[in-house]
């Protein structure tokens, strides 16, 4: 099935459980994307991407730790320990050839996407019940 809906790898387990007719466990972070495959929903407005590289490359002094938020219009990536990042307008530049990070015209967009990224990171936590005893 071809769809333009955005989904994340954290949605896989929720989708498998949904297909099997099982309820997701308490605290699962993903959401089933089966309705998006049927065209019944758009699923997510944005996705969060974490990339932790195994070693330094591409001119970086250390292994890349990258956090990205992507929606239909923008891709915004920050690199740990670096004073630069990446900002691409995916509607005007779908091949991501023009990095807008240092362009002052887009400073408001950088601020907005930074806030979205911080909010997403802030709400990442395991909400499953804690164990009653030590293992």
Report the location of each language-model feature.
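Generic anion/oxyanion-binding catalytic loop in active/binding sites
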Residues: 1, 22, 102
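A short, structured beta-strand-centered segment in the mid-to-C-terminal lobe
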Residues: 1-9
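C-terminal cap/loop subdomain of S1 sulfatases and analogous C-terminal strand-loop tails that border
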Residues: 10-13, 18-86, 90, 95, ...
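Active-site-proximal N-terminal segment of extracellular/periplasmic enzymes that hydrolyze or transfer
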Residues: 95, 100-105
């Amino acid at each position: 099935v071809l769809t333009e809906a955005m989904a994340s790898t954290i949605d896989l387990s929720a989708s498998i459980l949904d297909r099997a007719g099982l309820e997701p466990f308490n605290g699962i972070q993903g959401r089933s994307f089966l309705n998006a495959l049927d065209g019944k929903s758009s699923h997510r407005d944005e996705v969060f991407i974490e990339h932790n590289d195994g070693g330094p490359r591409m001119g970086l002094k250390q292994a890349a730790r990258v956090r990205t938020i992507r929606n239909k219009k923008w891709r915004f990536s920050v690199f740990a320990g670096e004073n630069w990042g990446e900002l691409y307008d995916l509607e005007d530049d779908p091949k991501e050839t023009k990095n807008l990070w240092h362009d002052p015209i887009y400073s408001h967009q950088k601020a907005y996407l930074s806030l979205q990224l911080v909010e997403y990171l802030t709400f990442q936590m395991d909400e499953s019940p804690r164990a009653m005893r030590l293992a």
